[in-house]
Amino acid sequence: MRVPPPFAWLVAAVCVAASPPGASAGVLIVEKTTTGGGPTQTHQVMIEKDSMRVEHDTPSGDKGTVLFDGTKQVTRLVNHDKKTYTEMTKADVDAMSQRMEGVMAQMQEHMKHMPPEQRARMEEKMKGRMAAAPVKITYRKVGSDTVGAWTCDRYDGYQDGQKVAELCTVDPTVLGFVPEDFEVSKKLGEFFRRLMPQNADNVFRLGNAEDQGFSGVPVKRVFTVGQRQTVTELTRVTREPFPASTFAVPEGFQRQALGARQ
C-alpha cells in the first residue's frame, strides 16, 4: 500500500532529513538525491538542537518544507506555493499506521484465495510498499571510494543475503560533527518508525560498528526498496546560526486537515 498524500513525498524527506544539529550553531547540510530514473533533486537540511527543517519539491513541483519539532513531537508539512500546511503528531502517525496495518491484513487475507500466478503478481506489486517491519540490514566493509571532496570507507548492506544498500562513510570529525549532533535524527526516525519502518533506519546518521555494522557518517547512501533505488550524496556542510522563523510555519499560511492533498 502506498503512503497516502500528502505523506508520499514525506518518505523521501525523512530519508534525507535526519541530519545533525550544531553544538554552538545550527548546521546547514546540502544533499542531492536521485530516485529511480527521475531527475536529481537538491535538498537543504537546517538543524538546531531539537528542530529540523527540510526544503524540497513536492511531486506536483511545488516548493515544500518539512518542519520537525523534536521536543513537542510534531511534524508540519508546508506547501509554500499554496500557502498551506498540515500538522501531524505522534498520535496521528500511530493512528494512521494502525489503519494501514488493518488494510494490509485484509489484502493478505484476500490474496490467500487468489490463483497462484495472480497472487505472485500481487505480492511483487506490493513488495516494498507495505509497512511491515523490515529485516535489519547487515553491513560489510568492502573497500574505499571518493565522494565529492571526501575519501570514504565503502560498505555493502544485506537483508536475508540480498544486497539492498551501499554506504560510503567518513569520520564525523572530518565534517565537524560530534555524537551529540545526531540526537534529533534519532527522534525523527522513531517518530515515523511505525508508519515507515523501511525508511526509519535509512536516515543520515552516525554509524556504530557494534550496533549497525558500519562506522562514521555516510556521505553517500544507496538504498533499494522493491524495484526502486534511491541515491543520496552529501555535497556541502556548514555551521551557521538560524533565526527562529526558520523552524516555524510562515505567518498567514492556512492549516489544512490531516490527509488533505498538499
Language model features with spans:
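Extended soluble regions of mature proteins
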Residues: 24-262
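Residue-level detector of alpha-helical transmembrane segments in integral membrane proteins
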Residues: 1, 13-14, 243
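Bacterial N-terminal signal peptides
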Residues: 8-19
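Positively charged n-region of N-terminal signal peptides that target proteins for export
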Residues: 1-8
